[in-house]
Amino acid sequence: NAMLKAVRIKFMLDGVIESHTAPMLQPYSDAGINGNPANSDFALPLELYRSLLNRFDKEGFQIYTHAIGDRSVREALNAYENAQAVNRTKGKRHRIEHIEQSSPEDLPRFAKLGVMASMEPIHADPGTIAVWATAVGEQRLSHSFVWASMLNHKAKLVFSSDWPACLTPDPMRGLHNAVNRRTIEGYPAAGWVPEQRISVKEALTAYTQGGAYSSFEEHTKGRIMPGFLADII
């Protein structure tokens, strides 16, 4: 009914970058330091993931895939592309969750496949990413939390908090990070990876209309207008 739906399946394809459990296309930059591994296996065997995704896609479910490392993001896109070809399905609005690292060559595939980019600006708070940034390394920082690049490639962007696995569920903090890429104290002054900052309008759209579109509710929520749900904070 309108209040309760069971129409989505979420897969955990990897872990997180801080613990080196998110598969990367290239080895972690701090491999070998304090016993850090060079890379990681997938949290779910790829063949099993692809098989289950195909099955649930065919049965009409919307699929969310937790993928943080750039290799995981690529394999998730590959799996969605395969499911569309095998099942001849389109318009499911499947999602990839988090996408903290991504290869530039994979970004156009989001719009092409109709896969939504579900990301959390609060995770890019410059005050909490020292371990993360060391693991990724300087050369890959420009590929980190690429909100602007996603929009430039016409991807559908949806923002959320990832609560309780984040600093705070407060969307105002998330909006601040998305627009400024600075801590609330103003560090760093120029912003962290500033080329990936987006406008207030773009960030607000991702937090509101993006989520509504993701759940096929863009005609009843996500905007302030007559007839829409008054989900206002």
Task: List the predicted regions and their residue ranges.
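His/Asp/Glu-enriched, well-ordered alpha-helical/loop segment
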Residues: 53-64, 71-94, 99, 104-108, ...
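Metal-coordinating catalytic core of metallo-dependent amide/deamination hydrolases
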Residues: 1-74, 78, 109-116, 122, ...
